[in-house]
Structure formats: structure tokens, C-alpha cells
Amino acid sequence: MSFFHFRGVYITIDDNSISKIYQILSNWPRKNVKAIVVTDGERILGLGDLGAYGMGIPVGKLALYVALAGIQPEWCLPVLIDVGTNNQKLLDDPFYTGLRRQRVRGPEYDQLLDNFMIAVTKRFGSETLIQFEDFASSNAFPLLDRYKNDYCTFNDDIQGTASVAVAGLIAATRLTKAKLSQTKIVFLGAGEAGLGIADLCVEQMKDEGLTEEQAREKIFLLNSKGLITKDRAHTVTVRHQKYAKDLPQMTTLLEVVKAVKPNVLIGVSTVAGAFTPEILGEMAKNNERPIVFALSNPTSKAECTAENAYRYTNGAVLFASGSPFDDVEMNGKIYKPGQGNNSYIFPGVALAAVLFKAKRIPDKTFLIAARRCAASVSEESLNEYARVYPSAEEIRELSVNIAIDIGNHLYEEGVATLHPEPEDKELFVREQLYSYEYEPTVNGLYDWPETDCRVGFPIPKSNEH
């Protein structure tokens, strides 16, 4: 195995002190770090527990910070927290570079994360953005709750996923002509993503006039055991209990769809093919324009394909997926399925947090980002192609607009520490953007008179007369 260059900073459970972590962070050659993406490698999307091999996730996310939001590369730092791995295949691999031990959990793990957060802010400043990525659900929610009011931090798997899903729903309601608060939503999957989306849907419904209780009544969660009902509320977390329904126990999605007659069906279960033709047909039977989001990644784990979604609803569905699908041609019309990818959201959120030096990131930030994303979907995209997200080419401009909207909110909430407040936020943001394109140093084409050319090359001319 050849090691060519470092790609980020590794911090292990054996470095569990503020001073040691501070020392490790000080080894990073750039001093003006403003954005960190950190993972412990436990729940790498579609791959599971990769331990120390999870470093590619922070590196990739920060590459998108640069490409999609124009954040300066020198401001970015990828970090991997190595507390071991429960992947026996890696532990048995003689070339595995991480700690060879089972994952550390409990107080020692919590202390390491506390020390990490303190060390980061001591080394780089209290406004340093810290994005948590691909932590297991058992850690993701507690860490977000513990740090979000004291640090500039967010969890993309929870909040970013929620924001992009709600953006798609808001855009879809422009075609259904019904507010989100007037719809019933069924979730297949009640993990980080499902709960995050449900919570943000509640916030949108509250802004549309419902109480929190009324909003939660419109949301139905299914986990691996079926619909979450009050009869089995004791078997789920407090977060799930808020959505428990006073209904008979139903173990299959088809039962729930037939009983509830939802307007929206969202899949975050990683169960391939869970949205069967019968379920899709039932959605079409109950809705003129059913909304179906199969958001699980990768493509092999999507709840249904785009082709099946359009086929079994006779083209009526407003469909989005977590993974890319090809365009679908049916009944003489071309459908362009939208991809509900977090990259519509987190680059713009990060850009705002970094440029306006946010002390923390309020929850409403992600609703603001969702609304801006939804508003960026053109009428042509909606009406001609039934696509509920902007095209990928528009993401960089979308990130700028999200950053401006969030910047206004940060100052309203008193959590932006950049002073004085820029009068023209758009101008301020655009002045800070990093360009990854090389400007040509010479003209690509020279005009030479044909008479001065011999076999395609210019003939030198003498200055002598």
C-alpha cells in the first residue's frame, strides 16, 4: 500500500484530551480553517461501517463545498474520528489502517466528542462550522441536540436531507394546488432521515397555520415492524412517540396506504422495491397527482425506479429519488425525475455560516433553504417534465441565493458575528466566491494572413528592409 499524501486529520479514541486533539489540529498546515466536516465512519452511505476508511466522506463533502458554493479550499478541513470498527472484515484485514478494536461507546465516546468540539473552537475560533456526517442514528440525534445551541454545527443526514425533501414537497404543491398542511404523508423508514424530514414538515405546516399537534397528526411513520402506533409506543424512542397513531396495528405499507389514503409517500428505508406496483397504483387511485419520493441510496436500494413510478401511475406521479435515474419516455411525453440530493442544500448553508460567521445555525435555517430551493424550480421544469428540483447546473447559483436568505435570518436572530452587517449581501457573497476555473493566459486562436503561413505555421518576418 502506497501513501502519497494526507487528505485530512485523524483523531482516535487514544487522543482523548483537549490538549492532545488541539495539538493534532495544529499540525494542519492551514491556519485559517473555517469549515470542518467530521465523521466517525460508522454509517457510510450504502456501505455501512468503514471505520478509518470513511475519510473519503469528509473529503468529498468539502469538495462539494468548493465546487457548488465557492467556499475557499484553504478554509476546509476533513476530520475522521477513529473509535474502532465493528466491521469484522476490516479488523481481519492486515492492511487496515485504523484502530483494530470494537467501537467505543458510552461516556468515553461522548467525552471524545466534547473534547473535539472544544479543541476545534480553541484552535480555529468559535465560529468554525462543524458539519457532522454519516454518524449512526444512536449518536447523530444526541450529538445534534447536545451541540446545536452552543456551536456552529449541523448534521447533514438529518437536517440537510430534511431540507431537500421538504423543498421537493413544496415545489410539488405548486402542481397539486394543495398546501403541505393539507396533505397526509406516509414515511417508509423512521431513522435519521425519516424523522428529520417529518420534523421539518411539521415546521412548514405550522407556518401554514396548523398547531404542532395538528401537523403531527398528518404524518405516519413506518419502521421495520410496521406503523408506529400508540400500542407499541414503548418500543420506540421519544422522537418516534410524538408521531404514534391511535390506530390498529398495521404491519405492511400496503395496509397503511389503503387505510390512510396519503397524498405523499416517502421512502427512506433502503428496502429495494418496497413501493410495489400495487402500492403505486393505490396512490394513483387516491390522488390526481400523487407525490412519491424514493429517497434511499444507492440506486440498488431505492424503493422503486423512476420508470415503475411513472408506469404504474400512468404518468400522474410527481416523483423524486435519492439516486439518479434516466429520463423516462411514456405516452409521448418525456419525464425528468428529480434527484433529491442534499447538495442542493448543504453548500449554501455552509457558505452562509462561514461568510457571516454564525455562532450557531438555527433550525429554521433549513426551512429557509428548502423554500429557496423550491422557488428555484422553473415552471417549465414542473409542467413539462414533472421535475421538482432545479437542474444540477443551477446549484452554484442556488447556493448563493440560499446563503443570502440565510444571512438575513442569521442577523435577524442575532447569531451572525460578522460586523458591520453587509448592506449588499449579494455583492458581499459574490465577492468571496472561489473560482476553480483557470483563465486562459494566451488567446486560443491567432489570426494569421494565409499568405504568411507555410504548412500551417506562421513565417517569421525580418525587421530589415
Q: Which residues fall in each region the model found?
A:
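N-terminal ligand-binding/catalytic initiation module
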Residues: 1-152, 409, 420, 426, ...
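Short acidic, glycine/serine/threonine-rich loops at helix termini
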Residues: 22-23, 46-57, 88-95, 140-146, ...
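Secondary-structure transition/capping motifs at alpha-helix termini
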Residues: 71, 123, 172-181, 203-217, ...
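Flexible, glycine/charged-enriched surface loops at secondary-structure junctions
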Residues: 127-132, 179-183, 208-217, 379-389, ...
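N-terminal Rossmann-like NAD(P) cofactor-binding subdomain of oxidoreductases
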Residues: 138, 228-230, 268-273, 279, ...
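Glycine-rich phosphate/diphosphate-binding loop of Rossmann-like nucleotide-binding domains
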Residues: 150-151, 155-267, 417, 448, ...
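Adenosine-phosphate binding glycine-rich loop
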Residues: 153-160, 173-176, 290, 294-422, ...
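Rossmann-fold NAD(P) dinucleotide-binding segment
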Residues: 252-261, 270-291
